[in-house]
Amino acid sequence: RPTTEGIFKSLDGHDPLGALQDIDLILDIPVKLTVELGRTKMTIKELLRLTQGSVVALDGLAGEPLDILINGYLIAQGEVVVVSDKYGVRITDIITPSERMRRLSR
């Protein structure tokens, strides 16, 4: 007689091993990390007047933490550092791993 044991997942909702295996499936998926220095709004006229050497003022204050986004969702804040002659960011505040996964699954 055929059996379905091992084919279908348990419906009781208590499968911690399955949850770990599910997360292993997504661990190598690339995500986009963005560090945001600040934002501003401008008119089309102002945009068209920009030239090399133009300075655009942003809403972020000097010394204020920078927003760190993953796929457009805020997950942390940090400060600018230099790493081997390149910019980097030191994380100063971050949401929990479970909250990060929840935001990415939206």
UniProtKB/Swiss-Prot annotation:
Main location: membrane
Subcellular location: Cell inner membrane; Bacterial flagellum basal body
GO cellular component assignments: bacterial-type flagellum basal body; plasma membrane
GO BP, sorted A to Z: bacterial-type flagellum-dependent cell motility; chemotaxis
Annotated keywords: Bacterial flagellum, Cell inner membrane, Cell membrane, Chemotaxis, Flagellar rotation, Membrane
Highest taxon of the lineage: Bacteria
UniProt-listed InterPro entries: FliN, FliN-like_C, FliN/MopA/SpaO, FliN_T3SS_HrcQb, SpoA-like_sf
One Pfam family matching this protein: FliMN_C
Membrane topology of the entry: Peripheral membrane protein
Gene Ontology terms for molecular function: cytoskeletal motor activity
Family: Belongs to the FliN/MopA/SpaO family.
General function of this protein: FliN is one of three proteins (FliG, FliN, FliM) that form the rotor-mounted switch complex (C ring), located at the base of the basal body. This complex interacts with the CheY and CheZ chemotaxis proteins, in addition to contacting components of the motor that determine the direction of flagellar rotation.
Protein name listed in UniProt: Flagellar motor switch protein FliN
Organism, as annotated: Pectobacterium carotovorum subsp. carotovorum
Lineage: Bacteria, Pseudomonadati, Pseudomonadota, Gammaproteobacteria, Enterobacterales
